[in-house]
């Protein structure tokens, strides 16, 4: 398959998710956490006690791409809105073995300078443009939060 979609990762199914990612399958799921930096730890925690937590965490930083955290806000009319609160790019420095979480959006604020070159290049190739923030309306909305 090209994509593996799990509506909500709650327990052992995260092992199938990670297995898919390590074979090059794109994966998407939802899970409960209050910060994108906790996503790898949360996934490892759902794998159970019979895993090497450090090794699993290290591998997740190599296969995860983006983490996105949404917040729920209610407007003055009582309507519920979900807004992007955080976006990060997971990375592994193969020289130092450091796990890196590049915070691209934090508290709704965009930090363009935190977009690593390899992510920037992937997005540029996908959208056929050098300006990865070419959606001016989205950029303005994120900057105004």
Regions found by a protein language model. Give the residues of each.
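Conserved P-loop NTPase nucleotide-binding/switch module
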Residues: 1-63
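Short proline/glycine-enriched turn/loop segments at secondary-structure junctions
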Residues: 56-57, 74-76
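Residue-level detector of flexible, active-site-proximal loop/helix-junction positions
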Residues: 34, 74, 91
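NTP-binding/hydrolysis catalytic cores, primarily Walker-type P-loop NTPases
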Residues: 77-145
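H-loop (His-switch) and adjacent beta-strand-loop-beta switch element
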Residues: 70-72
């Amino acid at each position: 398959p090209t994509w593996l979609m799990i509506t909500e990762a709650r327990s052992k199914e995260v092992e199938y998710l990670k297995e898919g990612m390590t074979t090059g399958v794109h994966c998407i799921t939802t899970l409960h956490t209050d910060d994108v930096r906790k996503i790898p730890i949360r996934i490892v925690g759902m794998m159970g006690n019979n895993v090497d937590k450090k090794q699993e965490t290290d591998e997740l930083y190599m296969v995860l791409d983006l983490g996105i955290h949404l917040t729920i806000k209610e407007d003055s009319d009582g309507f519920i809105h979900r807004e992007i609160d955080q976006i990060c790019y997971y990375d592994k420095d193969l020289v130092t073995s450091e796990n890196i979480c590049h915070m691209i959006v934090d508290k709704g604020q965009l930090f363009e300078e935190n977009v690593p070159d390899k992510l920037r290049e992937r997005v540029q190739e996908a959208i056929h443009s050098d300006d990865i923030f070419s959606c001016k309306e989205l950029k303005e909305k994120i900057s105004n939060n």
